[in-house]
Amino acid sequence: MESGFLNIGFSSYISVSKIIGIVSPDSAPIRRMIRLAKEQGRLVDATFGRRTRAAILTEGGFIVLSAVLPDTLVSRLEEEEEEEERTEPITEQEAELEEESGEDV
C-alpha cells in the first residue's frame, strides 16, 4: 500500500501513500471536520454532484470526498496489494524450480 493510486470514482485517483484513513461522513465529528476543511480550503470534492459516501483523510490535512462507499475503497486497496504481491519478482530459487518443472510458480 506504499505506492500507486486508488480509484475513488469517476476517473478520479488519489495517491495511496498519502492516505491516513477512509471514513463514513455520517457522524457529527466527521461532518464538522469536512465543514472546517471547506472553510480552510482543504476540501477536495470528487463526488461529481453525487451523494458523499466516503471521506478520505490525507497526510497533508486535506479531506477528499468520494461517492464510493468506504468498504468498496478498502476492498480496492486490498485488491491492489494482492496484485502487487502476485507481480513481485520471483527469487532465483523459484526461477530454477520453474525451469525444472516447466510450470509457473
From Swiss-Prot:
InterPro entries the UniProt entry points to: RemA-like
Listed Acidic residues bias regions: 78-105
Region Disordered, annotated ranges: 76-105
One Pfam family recorded for the sequence: RemA-like
Similarity section: Belongs to the RemA family.
Name of the molecule in the record: Putative regulatory protein COPRO5265_1186
Species, as recorded: Coprothermobacter proteolyticus (strain ATCC 35245 / DSM 5265 / OCM 4 / BT)
